[in-house]
């Protein structure tokens, strides 16, 4: 029966703590008024500490300590003293190893597939000035036009200038006054072909 009954001392403890706190506050006020003579930095609640450092100074201290920690801990070559180019080379090798190799593909295909026949083989011969045919390389059909690169800013500007000139030429064209859409269509076709 003694274990089932509890004393209600928690409320008394709270009230005694509050009264003790109030008495400490009043004592602190009296001491501070006597010592400082009601100084400007006096605050009603003695439990709140007046900050001696401004907010900007605190932030500056935090950033300084953080930067110092970074300088001591981090080096820019964190990958166990391997240069960036070496890491790139390794990655490139790994990618190349993943790609299928043509030799392996050729060995896996049947041999009779690649046997040369007279009908399938053709040799390219170029006629010379003297009239005799010699085997040589096929000339590239792609012409080097030295076109501006649209991906770069300077090339983009050049393309815009060219297009503006083309558009003004289309507007000056007498066909444009008769039928604007057909003139634009023809100009676009010419631009794509040339």
Curated annotation (Swiss-Prot):
Keywords: Nucleus, Ribosome biogenesis, rRNA processing
InterPro entries: Slx9-like
GO CC terms, sorted: 90S preribosome; nucleolus; preribosome, small subunit precursor
Superkingdom of this protein's organism: Eukaryota
Subcellular location: Nucleus, Nucleolus
GO biological process, one term: maturation of SSU-rRNA from tricistronic rRNA transcript (SSU-rRNA, 5.8S rRNA, LSU-rRNA)
Annotated spans, Disordered: 1-45
Assembly notes: Interacts with the 35S, 23S and 20S pre-rRNAs and with the U3 snoRNA.
Family membership noted in the UniProt record: Belongs to the SLX9 family.
Role: Involved in ribosome biogenesis. Required for normal pre-rRNA processing in internal transcribed spacer 1 (ITS1). May be involved in the movements of the replication forks.
UniProt protein name: Ribosome biogenesis protein SLX9
Organism encoding this protein: Scheffersomyces stipitis (strain ATCC 58785 / CBS 6054 / NBRC 10063 / NRRL Y-11545)
